[in-house]
Every structure is written in structure tokens, then in C-alpha cells.
Design a protein with these regions (language model features):
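Short histidine
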Residues: 70-72, 112
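Soluble periplasmic/extracytoplasmic beta-strand elements of cell-envelope proteins
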Residues: 39-41, 63-65, 73-75, 106-108, ...
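Hydrophobic residues in beta-strands and at strand termini
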Residues: 42, 56, 68, 76, ...
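N-terminal edge beta-strand
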Residues: 31-61
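Beta-strand cores of secreted/periplasmic/IMS beta-sandwich domains, seen most often
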Residues: 53-70, 92-101, 105
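Short, surface-exposed beta-strand/strand-loop-strand elements in extracellular ectodomains
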Residues: 75-82
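Extracellular/periplasmic metallocenter environments
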Residues: 2-9, 15-34, 88-127
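Short, solvent-exposed loop/turn elements at domain surfaces
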Residues: 47-49, 72-75
Length: 127
């Protein structure tokens, strides 16, 4: 192979590599954050209506709307600073937070009697 042919081949490979890098990332921008609302209904036995796993992606806004037949507090582990929902029997209560940590986090109900039970989970995927 001549020096000229070698140079043309090297330039072609470099251009193809650059085009791959440019077009590989084009059109794959992450979806913008979403607002997600989940409705849960609780009774003495735990979750009776609503999803057991509340799914989100980093940056999403999550609203949890809860109706319970007993008093207590609902909170999301690792997100205590963001969401604590005080529950009154028969009344709708809600809390909102931004999913700022990826992972799976338990949603726990602490009853007025001190009972502590997981009723659902928040699962946050990386963006």
C-alpha cells in the first residue's frame, strides 16, 4: 500500500469514527422530568388499592395521595426530609417530592398505635 493510500484510509477511518460519535448521541436526549401522581388506599391490612411499586425517573415530581381508614403517618424511607403525610381516618391526604435519588425505597405506614409496616415502594430509575 502506498503512503497516499494509507493516508486516505486513515482519514476515512477517522471521519467515520467522528460521524459515529456525533450520530450515536444525536436524538437520544433524556426525556424531561414528569409529574407522577399515585393514589393509594389503605386499611387495617395494608394497601387495598393502588400500585405496590410507585415508579419514577430521577428528577420526576411524585405526588402520593392517600386515603386510610385509620390515623397514622406515611413516609418514604430515604426521603423523610421531603415527604411525611399525616393521615386522618376517611380523609384524603397527600404529599409531594422530587425523586432526587435512584434506588428502591420503602413507603411505610406508622399507625397511631406505633405499628410500622411497609405498604408500597418507590422505585427511582436513573435518567
Amino acid at each position: 500500500m502506498t503512503a497516499r493510500a494509507l493516508a486516505v484510509t486513515a482519514i476515512t477511518v477517522a471521519l467515520l469514527g467522528a460521524m459515529y460519535i456525533v450520530f450515536r448521541t444525536a436524538g437520544h436526549a433524556p426525556a424531561p422530568p414528569q409529574s407522577r401522581t399515585y393514589r393509594l388506599r389503605l386499611d387495617d391490612h395494608g394497601l387495598t388499592s393502588g400500585p405496590a411499586v410507585l415508579e419514577a425517573v430521577l428528577g420526576d415530581s411524585i405526588t402520593i395521595v392517600v386515603t386510610s381508614n385509620r390515623a397514622g403517618t406515611l413516609h418514604v424511607h430515604e426521603y423523610e426530609q421531603h415527604i411525611v403525610i399525616d393521615l386522618e381516618p376517611g380523609r384524603e391526604s397527600s404529599g409531594r417530592f422530587t425523586a432526587d435519588r435512584a434506588g428502591r425505597f420503602g413507603v411505610h405506614l406508622i399507625g397511631a398505635d406505633g405499628a410500622h409496616a411497609q405498604v408500597a415502594a418507590v422505585e427511582v430509575q436513573p435518567r
